[in-house]
């Protein structure tokens, strides 16, 4: 099916033809035939790189040009940024594109001026909770990676959000994009959608197992040279020799880094002079953005053409790695499975070095087939690679047979709703009532019967869980006591708007009521004791140190569990460890020191602080509403967590481009406020932070003196990025 034959305005056809897209892939053509451009609901369950995003674009553009508004929902912030950059190309068609991924208690009415809005599932849910007016104007909703409805963490939010959007806008077109799953027909039936189910790919995918020096596919065998003792390194070299790149998936961050380092000496020999020059520039940027031990290792790897990628890296470092790979300079990325979750980063060959993952419940277990398929789907770059290869590694013949049967010859599992637990339902029941979607128990059950959970399980067990949630919400003062009506209290409405688990809100309110003196530690531990906080893992070497700290500061905790209750006490120690990380952060301990002390990555610091800033903001808001002590202290701590600094630096940190390191440098040099900066000479400031930053500072504080005449002045200390970031950038 040709682009020119589609029922689209000529300017859209020209846009794609000028981009080199003249003809639709078979699954795309099937989607058009099944009503994609006629406003029909559609589920596309097709492999990675088979053109799902183009389907979304065509549906959105058609709808917007007919006066509608499009919402594109993604599971990850990184994926939101990627799609936003892509959709901004539609500006030549007169389209306005917006993005929203954070600040969960804002309406973001300004986003409504856009024709296409990209948002995460959580942000979309919060926009609904805050009754954002333009949400009622949505004419087409795209749910990307909709198979993640199976995820215990993200699935319930996506499921409820889709249910609310469909009820709010019954005529709205829903386009769901999914990996190939076992029960795609069931998911399509729930969405009242036409199903496009296909295994077609634009590049052939050869899936197989590497054993004893040979890559075995279903219908062929391919010997691979063995220049080194590591089979995966040999597979990497074989790929580079044929002009390709590799993604290597590992089960842990440690293994990621280890393999990237292991491959350095071999990959370095394959680089051209141009590769080396470009990679040196990328490595320098990595060092400029971060001065931790991990970033130093990453820079060393990148200079040799290898890299690693995991959540312990900051967003800027991950983006540098991704861009270097897309440009073809970085030959191999060793990654945890997070890279398989939606980012557009294909490679000639995907190597899955470990197919087992650790579970606290059952130890090392084989990954699901669906997860394998997501990783394997990254093999083969459309229009660039003649084929793609997905390789599992076997150490024995028995393992070889197992891998073929488990992954190569098997289909993906069915996906199942994870909505039917009290933990999942508690927050969504409150928001459903607060938004007016349900005013009685009968209306609430009617709404929940439209969810995927009810579609799969009917009402089995749902009624009892709903009653438990309603009892909890009434008991904690978030719902009125009226047994015949469901009405949120002012407290309940605020909890819903703040996008916090009602249990977290109840724990915060109880903690503030019962606390004696509120210290930094008291408030930090209070937010770390909520289910919304992501806790640090307790290593064996942590127990004694954290326990000693608890004994020395017992009076600052609202309650210390009995150490003989082992499970409860260990959980408590994890809360304390996380509190201590935040304590070090707000007292300006260097990031590398924090990383080494807690056994984490720089990205973990920022992710933890990001969540903590949000929960501390919630704490300040709840304390203010309920007239509890701690509102002022929590508000001050919220800002300190945002910047990772002591109170005296807050005035300086209100200036963009001044982060915790530069603020401390300016403060120690005698410039303790924006007023003192305004009275200073540009030359003096430039010696401290450099001319570029000085120019930015002076523009913001109302002095636009040119600093170009002293552009040769270097700052006293080099190494910090020109664009220091706050937590919200991560």
Curated annotation (Swiss-Prot):
GO terms for biological process: DNA repair. GO terms for molecular function: 3'-5' DNA helicase activity; ATP binding; ATP hydrolysis activity; DNA binding. ATP binds at residues 28, 46-53. It catalyses: Couples ATP hydrolysis with the unwinding of duplex DNA by translocating in the 3'-5' direction; ATP + H2O = ADP + phosphate + H(+). Its EC number is 5.6.2.4. Keywords: ATP-binding, DNA damage, DNA repair, DNA-binding, Helicase, Hydrolase, Isomerase, Nucleotide-binding. The keyword ATP-binding applies. Residues 33-199 form the Helicase ATP-binding domain. The keyword Zinc does not apply. Residues 232-433 form the Helicase C-terminal domain. A motif (DEAH box) lies at residues 144-147. InterPro entries: DEAD/DEAH_box_helicase_dom, Hel308-like_dom4, Hel308_SKI2-like, Helicase_ATP-bd, Helicase_C-like, Helicase_Hel308, HTH_61, P-loop_NTPase. PANTHER family: ATP-DEPENDENT DNA HELICASE HEL308, DNA POLYMERASE THETA, PUTATIVE (AFU_ORTHOLOGUE AFUA_1G05260)-RELATED. Belongs to the helicase family. Hel308 subfamily. DNA-dependent ATPase and 3'-5' DNA helicase that may be involved in repair of stalled replication forks. Monomer. This is ATP-dependent DNA helicase Hel308. It comes from Methanosarcina mazei (strain ATCC BAA-159 / DSM 3647 / Goe1 / Go1 / JCM 11833 / OCM 88). The lineage of its organism: Archaea, Methanobacteriati, Methanobacteriota, Stenosarchaea group, Methanomicrobia. The gene is hel308.
């Amino acid at each position: 099916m040709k682009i020119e034959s589609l029922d689209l305005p000529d300017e859209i056809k020209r846009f794609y033809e000028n981009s080199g897209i003249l003809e639709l892939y078979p699954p795309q053509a099937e989607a058009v035939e099944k009503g994609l451009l006629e406003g029909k609901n559609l589920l596309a369950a097709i492999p990675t790189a088979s053109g799902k995003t183009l389907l979304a674009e065509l549906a959105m553009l058609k709808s917007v040009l007919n006066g509608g508004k499009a919402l594109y929902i993604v599971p990850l912030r990184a994926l939101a940024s990627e799609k936003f950059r892509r959709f901004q190309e539609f500006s030549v068609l007169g389209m306005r594109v917006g993005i929203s991924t954070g600040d969960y208690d804002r309406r973001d009415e300004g986003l409504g001026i856009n024709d296409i809005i990209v948002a995460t599932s959580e942000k979309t849910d919060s926009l609904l909770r805050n009754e954002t007016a333009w949400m009622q104007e949505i004419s087409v909703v795209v749910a990307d990676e909709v198979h993640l409805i199976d995820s215990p963490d993200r699935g319930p939010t996506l499921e409820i959000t889709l249910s609310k959007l469909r009820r709010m806008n019954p005529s709205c077109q829903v386009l769901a994009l999914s990996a190939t799953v076992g029960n795609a027909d069931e998911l399509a039936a729930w969405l009242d959608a036409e199903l496009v189910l296909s295994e077609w790919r634009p590049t052939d995918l050869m899936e197989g197992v590497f054993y004893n020096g040979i890559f075995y596919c279903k219908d062929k065998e391919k010997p691979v040279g063995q220049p080194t003792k590591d089979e995966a390194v040999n597979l990497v070299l074989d790929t580079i020799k044929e002009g390709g790149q590799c993604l290597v998936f590992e089960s842990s961050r440690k293994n990621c880094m280890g393999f990237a380092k292991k491959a350095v000496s071999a990959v370095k020999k394959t680089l051209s002079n141009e590769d080396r020059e470009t990679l040196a520039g990328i490595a320098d940027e990595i060092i400029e953005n971060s001065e931790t031990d991990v970033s130093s290792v990453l820079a060393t790897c990148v200079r040799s053409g290898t890299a690693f990628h995991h959540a312990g890296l900051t967003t800027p470092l991950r983006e540098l790695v991704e861009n270097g790979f897309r440009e073809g300079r970085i030959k191999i990325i060793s990654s945890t499975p997070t890279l398989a979750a939606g980012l557009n980063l294909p490679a000639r060959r995907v190597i899955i070095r470990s197919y087992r993952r650790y579970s606290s419940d059952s130890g090392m277990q084989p990954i699901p087939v669906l997860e394998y398929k997501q990783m394997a789907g990254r093999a083969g770059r459309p229009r660039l690679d003649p084929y793609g290869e997905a390789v599992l590694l076997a150490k024995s013949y028995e393992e070889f047979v197992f891998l073929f049967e488990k992954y190569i010859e098997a289909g993906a599992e069915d996906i199942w709703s994870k909505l039917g637990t009290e933990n999942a339902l508690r927050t969504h029941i409150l928001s459903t009532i607060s938004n007016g979607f349900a005013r009685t128990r009968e209306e609430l059950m009617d709404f929940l019967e439209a969810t995927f959970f009810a579609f799969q399980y009917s009402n089995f067990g749902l009624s009892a869980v709903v009653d438990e949630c309603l009892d909890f919400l009434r008991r904690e003062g978030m719902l009125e006591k009226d047994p015949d009506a469901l009405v949120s209290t002012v407290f309940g409405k605020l909890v819903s708007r703040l996008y916090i688990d009602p249990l977290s809100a109840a724990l915060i309110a109880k903690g503030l009521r019962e606390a004696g003196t509120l210290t930094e530690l008291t408030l930090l531990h209070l937010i770390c004791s909520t289910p919304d906080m992501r806790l640090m893992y307790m290593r064996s070497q942590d127990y004694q140190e954290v326990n000693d700290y608890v004994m020395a500061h017992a009076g600052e905790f609202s309650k210390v569990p009995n150490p003989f209750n082992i499970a409860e006490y260990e959980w408590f120690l994890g809360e304390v460890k996380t509190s201590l990380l935040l304590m070090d952060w707000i007292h300006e301990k260097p990031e590398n020191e924090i990383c080494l002390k807690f056994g984490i990555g720089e990205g973990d610091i920022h992710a933890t602080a990001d969540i903590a800033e949000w929960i501390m903001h919630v704490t300040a808001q709840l304390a203010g509403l309920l007239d509890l002590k701690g509102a002022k202290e929590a508000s001050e701590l919220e800002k300190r967590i945002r910047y990772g600094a002591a109170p005296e630096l807050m005035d300086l940190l209100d200036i963009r481009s001044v982060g915790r390191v530069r603020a401390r440098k300016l403060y120690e040099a005698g410039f303790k406020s924006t007023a003192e900066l305004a009275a200073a000479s540009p030359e003096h400031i430039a010696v401290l932070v450099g001319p570029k930053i000085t120019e930015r500072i002076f523009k913001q504080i109302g002095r636009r003196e040119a600093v170009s005449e002293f552009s040769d002045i270097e700052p006293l200390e080099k190494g910090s990025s020109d664009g220091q970031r706050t937590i919200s950038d991560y």
